[in-house]
Amino acid sequence: GVKATLDHCTDGELISDELAKEGLPVFVGPTLGSKSKAELRHKSFTTPGALYHAGLTVSIITDAPVIPLEKLPMCAGLAANAGLPMEEAWRAITINPARSLGIDSRVGSLEPGKDADLVLWTADPLTTIGAEAYCTIVDGKVVYQAE
């Protein structure tokens, strides 16, 4: 069968009880930016936390290139600041989207046999706006190293 997800879900907080009955994984975003369309008028960084507390598997998205991908950690941090537990904020940008898309056997967490992709930061990128990547590893090989 078809494995469905609910994408964008920017105002899903308003119907979190109904969404919980369906149990579909939700992808929330883009939340950063203006409320330029009618369907965005209720968007808020409280939505990921509300959906998580309703029992849903939450992923956070930027809808890149609408909001640049490098803003993803900041979006997760803002969701944590608005009620999503910090550990769940990390899951919302790592293992949750991988599981929801059925690719968690390869990516989403650091485990033997999975792709060895990793970014090392100067500080926690979810809580520190000035955090910078100082080392990036792809397939187990260093592809970027800050000077």
Residue ranges and their predicted role:
Residues 146-147:
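Short, solvent-exposed mixed-charge patches
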Residues 136:
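Short aromatic-centered micro-motifs
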Residues 129-131:
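Short, small/polar residue-rich loop motifs at catalytic or cofactor-binding pockets
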Residues 17-25, 29-33, 37-123, 127:
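His/Asp/Glu-enriched, well-ordered alpha-helical/loop segment
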Residues 3-12, 31, 35-37:
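Catalytic beta/alpha-barrel core
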